[in-house]
Amino acid sequence: MRALARFALCAAPLAVALLRAAPAAAIERNFAGSAQLDYLFVPDATSGPAGRDVYDGFTTEVALKLAADLSDHLSANVKVCYGCHGFELPMAYFDFRVADELVFRVGRFSPSFGAFNIRQDPANHATSDNPLPYDMGRMLRLTQWNLGVLPSPFPDNGVEVGGTHWFGERAQLDWAAYAISGFRAPTGATDLLWILSQTRSGNLIDNNGRPGGGGRVAATFRFGDGNDVTVGGSVMYGTWDPANRFYYLIGGGDLSARIGRTQLRLEYLVRRQTFPVDPAVPFKLPAPASGQDQFEKHGAYIEAERAMTETVTLLLRADGLYRAGNNPLASPLATRAAVFRYTAGGTLALAPGLRLKASGELWAFTNDVPYHQELELAFHLSLVGTF
């Protein structure tokens, strides 16, 4: 109830402003939403090597969005979602468009990074969960890995400047640069604490007063009707501790192609992060004399999606995570550890705006990369609706 109350206090004033900002004839509004009920069955959820380190069973994800065009140059968006994290306010911002090539975004939003973030809503992709580089809590052994490289969505407070430029009718360039509060963790932590960036944490104030920043550039080339290729690159940097001593640097590249009824997608992410070494905590590798160590977390996925008919879509995906670097002796992960996942799934349209999703996953965990040491199975069945 407290989370719901906080959301109401945050979102209600902006929603009222959107609804009453101008006479009905002068403002265009759009209200949309989606809901997904997913059941995740993991046969070894309680008896496997990691124990019950997964959000299996039923989970619900709901998203409601209100968008309004206040004028030819000003628009506003508010979005609330509900899921395993409780209530969240991932979107509450204004866009001021000077031209197609220059748009200012101010408020709370997910900064431009990667290609998946654009379609991270469950209604916009064929599987029940995110690719592993962007995992937000549906992966197996989630606490061991502390989610993905960059859990999506990743809303933050700040400002973004971006735009789109067309080169004729066949080529398009998108760009964005932003300054945000940045990810954070308390003093002495060895990894980011993602909950501190979420509304449910109850405190969205920057812990060190120094903004993080980054940007993205993407180019799209069109080859006839229904055929295009997009290539993009993204970067993000910030300090995460109260004293601004330790940093994270995230980079990514993406490639996607649409060829008739088939879509191909490939993304690669890496996060390099420094952290303090506590002399009282034993680590697996000798600690540097400086008291500062680092690790890298890599993630990638490749998937092919094809619309077989007007109602049936099939998907194949391979994705994984790889961590390299020092960690506490108590961690079950070695200094070189990886997880691989192989997914086959599909969707069935039951009615306009209503789809059934099903997928099977083979997981492989290893502390001896690239060998697959421990195998687990998982199965998703979900129903998703949009309006």
Predicted feature locations:
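Sec-dependent, cleavable N-terminal signal peptides
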Residues: 15-18
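Outer-membrane beta-barrel pore domains
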Residues: 49-51, 92-96, 117, 126, ...
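Juxtamembrane/transmembrane-helix boundary motifs at the membrane-water interface
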Residues: 42-49
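Bacterial N-terminal signal peptides that target proteins for export
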Residues: 1-12
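Loop-centered beta-sheet repeat module
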Residues: 185-241
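Short, contiguous, pocket-lining structural segments
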Residues: 153, 202-212, 243-247, 254, ...
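Outer membrane beta-barrel
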Residues: 27-41, 53-185, 209-214, 218-225, ...
